[in-house]
């Protein structure tokens, strides 16, 4: 597939090469993520479960505001980069998560779509002030070396999808649905384990699984070409495909806790909005956050 290049394919491959070159930069520290995964839940320490719940809350906010998946992916990247470097107490996680989310929103969304910090805090039902949020933003920025933008799995998913989609017969193109792939990526982001995968590997694992499920044999060669071009080993791809498959199976079951978008809709209903007092008057100010490095 990649050997015979159209002008559009050449542009896509140029973009892919740029992403591959930048991929290793601005990613979470795997050793830090492993520490979180191994932590016991005592109500004080950061754990994988708490991290995953926070990401689900960020996904609910993303859906509520209608933000792009790239915004959500970047917010998760920032959160995991910070958590993998710093020892964060559970009581500070909401402020950290919302700060990462707000940074991602301001970096990717149009300025007119960026909500006020006061509105974001109120809708999220957190009990901290705008000054707390701004202070946490500065801490996050310092710990990620002021590098907000990063290469994400969503960017790879877009490119990989574009490379294979146009090779399908016209009548079958609608079956390989990008929104479905986006939803699968969001589900994976809600599990900390997938932040240990390279963004390119996670994206290709999701796409390859979907192609297998649709029995698109004609795209197998294309996936193999992308895999080779991206220098992804067969072992790595198989390993992460199995984990993605397991995650999606669990996510589609009733046992899985899914993001609660309805809760946010209720919070800002007309009746509720009239009853809400300004957040400042019911604030419990956060204590100074110790900047302890892992």
From Swiss-Prot:
It comes from the Eukaryota. The keyword Cell cycle applies. The keyword Cell division applies. Pfam families: Cyclin_N. InterPro entries: Cyclin, Cyclin-like_dom, Cyclin-like_sf, Cyclin_N. GO terms for biological process: cell division. Highest levels in kidney, heart and skeletal muscle. Keywords: Cell cycle, Cell division, Cyclin, Mitosis, Nucleus. GO terms for cellular component: nucleus. It is found in: Nucleus. Belongs to the cyclin family. Cyclin G subfamily. Binds to B' regulatory B subunits of protein phosphatase A (PP2A) following induction by p53 (in vitro). May play a role in growth regulation. Is associated with G2/M phase arrest in response to DNA damage. May be an intermediate by which p53 mediates its role as an inhibitor of cellular proliferation. This is Cyclin-G1.
């Amino acid at each position: 597939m990649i050997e015979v290049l159209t002008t559009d394919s050449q542009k896509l491959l140029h973009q892919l090469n740029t992403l591959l070159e930048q991929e290793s930069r601005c990613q979470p520290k795997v050793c830090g993520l492993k520490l979180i995964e191994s932590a016991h839940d005592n109500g004080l320490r950061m754990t994988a479960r708490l991290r995953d719940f926070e990401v689900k809350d960020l996904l609910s906010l993303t859906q509520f505001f209608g933000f792009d998946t790239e915004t959500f992916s970047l917010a998760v990247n920032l959160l995991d980069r910070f958590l993998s470097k710093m020892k964060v107490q559970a009581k500070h996680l909401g402020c950290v998560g919302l700060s990462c989310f707000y940074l991602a929103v301001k970096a990717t969304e149009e300025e007119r779509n960026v909500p006020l910090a006061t509105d974001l805090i109120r809708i999220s039902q957190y009990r901290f002030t705008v000054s707390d949020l701004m202070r946490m933003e500065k801490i996050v920025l310092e710990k990620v070396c002021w590098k907000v933008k990063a290469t994400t799995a969503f960017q790879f998913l877009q490119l990989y999808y574009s490379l294979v989609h146009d090779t399908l017969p016209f009548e079958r193109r609608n079956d390989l649905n990008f929104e479905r792939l986006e939803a699968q990526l969001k589900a994976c982001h809600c599990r900390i384990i997938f932040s240990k995968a390279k963004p390119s590997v996670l994206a290709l694992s999701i796409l390859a699984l979907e192609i297998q499920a649709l029995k698109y044999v004609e795209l197998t060669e294309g996936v193999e070409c992308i895999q080779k071009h991206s220098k992804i080993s067969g072992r790595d791809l198989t390993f992460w495909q199995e984990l993605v498959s397991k995650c999606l199976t669990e996510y589609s079951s009733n046992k899985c806790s899914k993001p609660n978008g309805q809760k946010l809709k209720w919070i800002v209903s007309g009746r509720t909005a009239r009853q809400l007092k300004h957040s400042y008057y019911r604030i419990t100010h956060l204590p100074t956050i110790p900047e302890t490095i892992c």
